[in-house]
Regions:
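Terminal-appendage/accessory-domain detector
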Residues: 1-112, 208, 213-223, 230-458
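Well-ordered alpha-helical scaffold segments within catalytic/enzyme domains
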Residues: 53, 122-129, 175-181, 228-232, ...
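Hydrophobic alpha-helical hairpins/lids featuring a short glycine-rich hinge
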Residues: 97-152
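Well-ordered alpha-helical segments within folded domains of soluble proteins
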Residues: 116-123, 170-177, 223-227, 289
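Short glycine/serine-rich loop segments
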Residues: 121, 169, 178-185, 190, ...
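Structural helix-adjacent loops and short alpha-helical linkers that scaffold large soluble proteins
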Residues: 128-140, 183-190, 238-241, 302
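Aromatic-lined, polymer-binding surfaces characteristic
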Residues: 146-172, 218
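Flexible glycine/proline-rich, aromatic-decorated loop/lid segments
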Residues: 195-203
Length: 458
């Protein structure tokens, strides 16, 4: 299917309805093979994050909480997790797991993690509805389009007001994706989006403490987005029309934006899922270009971490809340420029092991983390969010200065993560839960663009 909102924006149609119509049309005119392949890559990445996340104490605690609330087993599985649950519980718990280790994908221009809300919601529903893989992939494409279209309009206005765009826009994307899978028409999908918008929320207050609440934002969005789609199908309530751009709608409430005609979404040459990134490193995406710069410096110059007197990072304003974060917990360390920069310099890589409690007590990394400074520059600001730049300068004890500029981090649409690298990332994550033979089979199966039953993932 061609990405053409001009055809969807019929006379008198609102931008919200045009998005809903576009989602509904995916069932009749499926995306191109290239777009489906990209959807499969994001699904592979997301399910790998989900499997790894299921082993985290925070996720296990969330599972125990849900078990205590509802002791009766449900019909729907958890990918990589125990027992069976209601469809809403499954969606919410898988979304928390997807985001637990900062491995999940994102979209820079919207500053959003779309897959962590969309994929778990559609997977849980797909299991319940006995859907096939191609229908699932199409619904994921639809959910990305809605979530990113909202988020890229809200960003940076919403974050400046203290809102995180992932739960604000992600809940509406999850609703659109689930409504698409359920076979609702444009009016029904718009109703689901309208219902979901009342569940939008999520604050950036965690940057000042309580960082693990961030992990629950996608869980809320996935669960309530799915609930909204089910409500729309059953006719339980009618969602407000034009909920994105309308008076007191999403854009006005969260971004102070009073006018939106959807033109930015219409003008995109590629669907949102093809413009979203996959992470090579399990940490905040704002830090990735600086990691790439350190890796480039290691590749072209002979130096050791012990030679470094100071690490100077230049970045853009949206990244600055991470400039001086501590690293006392795994969740906050993954968002901390000082810790990640020091880790990259000392170990020459950034992996999950570098955020463990044992790693966070290492004297060598702690000493270098104290020597990291981060500054906002006009040069970086002028390029963001169209690109995500950073410059890293290492000041060596010898007096020498080594500097590297990265215009866009690895994993972006312009610098895509290779299939081989994605498969390695997925294999490492799946390997925490599944035996080697199952890992190989999973990766191969998720790359098959065929209508095989989603039940095979149970």
């Amino acid at each position: 299917m061609t990405h053409d909102f001009k055809g969807s924006l019929m006379a008198g149609a609102t931008p919200t309805r045009a998005l809903a119509d576009w989602c509904a049309a995916l069932r009749d005119s499926r995306p191109s093979e290239a777009v489906l392949r990209e959807s499969a890559r994001h699904v592979l990445d997301t399910l790998a994050a989900c499997a790894a996340g299921m082993r985290q104490p925070l996720v296990r605690a969330a599972i125990e909480l849900e078990r205590g609330i509802n002791a009766q087993p449900g019909p729907v599985a958890l990918f990589g997790g125990p027992e069976r649950w209601t469809v809403l519980e499954s969606a919410g718990l898988m979304a928390v797991a997807c985001h637990a280790l900062e491995m999940d994908d994102g979209n820079r221009e919207g500053s959003i993690h779309p897959a962590t809300t969309v994929v778990p919601a559609v997977l849980a529903l797909g299991w319940q509805q006995e859907a096939d893989y191609l229908a699932f992939l199409c619904a994921v494409v639809a959910g990305f389009e809605v979530a990113v279209s909202i988020a890229e309009t809200l960003h940076p206005h919403a974050s400046q007001r203290g809102f995180q765009t992932t739960p604000v826009a992600g809940v509406v994307g999850a609703a659109a994706a689930c409504a698409t899978l359920l076979g609702l028409d444009g009016a029904g999908i718009e109703s689901a989006m309208g219902l979901a918008a009342s569940a939008s929320g999520g604050l950036f207050a965690y940057l000042a403490g309580g960082g693990n609440v961030k992990k629950f934002h996608p869980g809320h969005a996935a669960r309530e987005g799915l609930r909204a789609a089910l409500m729309a199908r059953q006719g339980v309530a009618q969602g407000p029309r034009g909920v994105i751009e309308g008076r007191a709608g999403l854009l006005q409430a969260f971004g102070g934006i009073t006018q939106w005609d959807g033109s930015r979404a219409r003008e995109r040459a590629a669907p949102a899922i093809a413009r979203s990134y996959l992470k090579p490193y399990p940490c905040c995406r704002h830090i990735h270009p600086a990691i790439d710069a350190v890796m480039a410096l290691k590749a072209r110059a002979a130096w050791q971490a012990a030679d470094v007197a100071a690490i100077e990072v230049e970045t853009y304003g949206a990244a600055m809340p991470h400039a001086r974060l501590p690293w006392d917990t795994l969740e906050v360390a993954q968002l901390s420029f000082p810790w990640v920069m020091a880790l990259a310099c000392v170990d020459g890589e950034v992996t999950l092991a570098g955020f463990s409690e044992a790693a966070r007590t290492r004297p060598d990394i702690n000493a270098l983390a104290a020597c990291v400074s981060v500054a906002q520059t006009q040069e970086c600001d002028s390029l963001y969010p169209a690109s995500g730049p950073a410059r890293v300068t290492l000041r060596l004890r010898s007096g020498e200065r080594l500097s590297e500029w990265v215009a866009d981090p690895l994993g972006s649409a312009d610098r895509p993560l290779a299939d081989e690298a994605l498969d390695r990332k997925a294999a490492e994550a799946f390997g925490l839960v599944f035996p080697a033979a199952r890992v190989r089979a999973l990766i191969g199966q998720l790359r098959r663009l065929e209508p095989w039953p989603l039940a095979e993932l149970n």
